[in-house]
Amino acid sequence: MARRYLLEFEKPLVELEKQIEQIRELARDSEVDVSQQLLQLETLAARRREEIFNALTPAQKIQVARHPQRPSTLDFIQMFCDDWVELHGDRNCSDDKALIGGIARIEEKSVLVIGQQKGRDTKENVARNFGMAKPGGYRKALRLMNHADRFKLPIISFIDTPGAYAGLLAEEQGQGEAIAVNLREMFRLRVPIISTVIGEGGSGGALGIGVADRLLMFEHSVYTVASPEACASILWRDAGKAPDAAAALKITGSDLMALGIVDEVLSEPSGGNNWAPLKAGEVLKESLIRNLRELDSLSIRQLRDKRYEKFRQMGRFLEPSSLDEELIT
């Protein structure tokens, strides 16, 4: 069994995990019946894990969203997408591996799937540029979305990026323009679009494939205008204030539901999606099918009008509370 990567706030579970592994090894190496002891320890570990995850701060949710074993775009595709065929290239000069896309079927319904893809280890992350797409990635996504529009395929996008790549070459190649064009063109598409934040939803990098009729989000995912570290560095010149920035930015599913940004927050297994990826896949698949069914009942005009109106409603603001004022002073 692959060793679990535990986050700092999960360290109280380390000793229990060791005991559970020892008992499993004992059961494999002998005929001693340890099922009762194993059940007791697993129940205790599950209860403590649930207590920890029910009290996560926004800063801790970011750690969960960035967990190296959290299911990725390709993981979810393998879980519930049949006949997956990846499509490559922006038909200009690149094939960005940080943003993938292709045709698949979900419950006999043909769809276009696009999404950012991170790596599992350093080598994969370098190849995938840590999920940070360059201009070619967004142009590839737009090419595929236009393909979907032409053939009347609903679009499913999975968002998982710290942000669009901000390197010099990316800026020279028109990173801002590529994202801006995607925003404009996605409002014009005549097919249903469902976006899901499966991990990090960072800044314009997320928005580049995030103009959707329905925006879903896992409960331990985050969706933010800027990373808390960057925000703290800008506001206070101190990245150590990232937890304060995380609280002020309203990056969690519950906050974004209250603000009318997110349409649905998907529940995660106890401990996060990395503890039970298949269960997370079942939850996501059910929601996608349900939302696709609802959107299919709308005419093209209704679809585009509602999508436009949804984003026009964003940007409302509240007067800052005393706590917010303390955070920004």
Swiss-Prot record:
Residues 40-294 form the CoA carboxyltransferase C-terminal domain. PROSITE patterns: COA_CT_CTER. Pathway: Lipid metabolism; malonyl-CoA biosynthesis; malonyl-CoA from acetyl-CoA: step 1/1. It catalyses: N(6)-carboxybiotinyl-L-lysyl-[protein] + acetyl-CoA = N(6)-biotinyl-L-lysyl-[protein] + malonyl-CoA. GO terms for biological process: fatty acid biosynthetic process; malonyl-CoA biosynthetic process. GO terms for molecular function: acetyl-CoA carboxylase activity; ATP binding; carboxyl- or carbamoyltransferase activity. It is found in: Cytoplasm. One of its GO terms (cellular component) is acetyl-CoA carboxylase complex. Keywords: ATP-binding, Cytoplasm, Fatty acid biosynthesis, Fatty acid metabolism, Lipid biosynthesis, Lipid metabolism, Nucleotide-binding, Transferase. It comes from the Bacteria. Pfam families: ACCA. The keyword Magnesium does not apply. Component of the acetyl coenzyme A carboxylase (ACC) complex. First, biotin carboxylase catalyzes the carboxylation of biotin on its carrier protein (BCCP) and then the CO(2) group is transferred by the carboxyltransferase to acetyl-CoA to form malonyl-CoA. PANTHER family: ACETYL-COENZYME A CARBOXYLASE CARBOXYL TRANSFERASE SUBUNIT ALPHA, ACETYL-COENZYME A CARBOXYLASE CARBOXYL TRANSFERASE SUBUNIT ALPHA, CHLOROPLASTIC. Belongs to the AccA family. This is Acetyl-coenzyme A carboxylase carboxyl transferase subunit alpha.
